[in-house]
Amino acid sequence: MEKKKMSLPVQIVLALILGIVVGLIFYFIGKPEITTNYFKPFGTIFVNLLKFIVVPVVLLSMIDGIISMGDMKKVGSVGWKTVAYFLVTTAAACVIGLVFANIFLNAGLFPTDLALTDGQTWDGATSANFMDTLVAIFPSNMWKSFTDANMLQVIVIALMFGGGILAAGEKGKLAQDLVSSLYSVIDRVMAFIISLSPIGVFTMMTWVVANQGPEILGHLALVLLCAYVGYIVHAIICYSVSASAFAGVSPLKFFKGAAPAMIFAFTSTSSAATIPLSKECADEMGAESDVSSFVIPLGATINMDGTAIYQCVATIFLAACCGMTLTLGQMVTIVVTATLASIGTAGTPGAGMIMLAMVLEAMNIPVDMIMLIYGIDRLFDMGRTCLNITGDISCALCVTKWESKKAAQTAK
């Protein structure tokens, strides 16, 4: 009798659990440097492989998706529905973040007696000009966009080439076949890299737990908990409910289907690196391949719901540390600023911190206060990345259903 092979999602879950256990062992015996020297390098190799494959995956999957749609009108329809979905859920994420932050604050669960030590200053970016970002979206050198892994520019390149191939008609047939062939090759390479996920998850999780143990158990634990409660509630209320209401996928089926990508995103903290798994999960739950090929890469770049919750929680906490009590009007300003900032900083390295700095400036809170939570940013990042890609999958399912209904009505 042939022995049944353990599925990749199960392997990833076991690797995650084992990584936590081994990480705790190294933390409690006081040898976290072992994980830094001997575990993290293998995790870094895995992450490097993911970064290496991200640009060709985004480029070819989006071009292939556009070609598969066969009509730029459909591309436009899918595009505006995707952006609208993300804007609405980002605004909802801000509200959820503010609600739970205020609950924790009023219950006395936030350590508001913290203060900056001498020399603690924030020297990162504090603003991002939307018009500058808009100009930067359009590449002047295609190859530089690829080498810099500028995902917004890669998406624009994909849109232009995909549209160009469709516009060329029969003369573009060779280009269509070339894209399809290259994407098949990249898909195989991608499958091999993803098969290494358990190793990457185990080594990275071991390193994180062993080195971040004090912060997890320390005085910022409740601030971290508040953000994670917000992440979970948002995933249930916005993503699973919308997938159920609009795409007919039950919450249980949705989370079970999205689990491999969620776990992978949690440990890798990279939405872009999770694109292949996110697309696979969405397709298996009923998303059309051409729609998911377009929505997932776009969402990995512009969907920042997890970041929105994080910065709302962080703003309320840091304001309390300054002795400030924010009014309802100021909280509305946070929602508007955070939602617009998610567009203005899309695709920007360190976007989470830039967005938070923008919100703090809008509230007249000293930007240097960021340093109080900067040390555990990776722990926040794990949860917010997981939430972001969950939203990408939900969006792909919803847009697929909306487009199929539209097609059915047109056919009548």
Spans of features found by a protein language model:
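Juxtamembrane helix-boundary/capping and inter-helix hinge elements in multi-pass membrane proteins
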Residues: 67-74, 109, 168-173, 181, ...
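Residue-level signature of catalytic and energy-coupling elements of molecular machines
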Residues: 7, 46, 75, 146, ...
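Helix-loop-helix junctions within the multi-pass membrane cores of secondary transporters/permeases
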Residues: 260-342, 396, 406-412
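Transmembrane helix-bundle signature of multi-pass membrane transporters/permeases
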Residues: 45, 63, 82-87, 160, ...
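Transmembrane helix boundary and interhelical junction motifs in multipass membrane proteins
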Residues: 54-58, 197-200, 270-278, 308-313, ...
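Membrane-water interface of transmembrane alpha-helices in multipass transporters/channels
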Residues: 31-38, 76, 214-222, 248-259, ...
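Signature of multi-pass transmembrane helix bundles
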Residues: 2-3, 9-13, 20-35, 47-50, ...
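Transmembrane alpha-helical segments and their short flanking loops
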Residues: 312-412
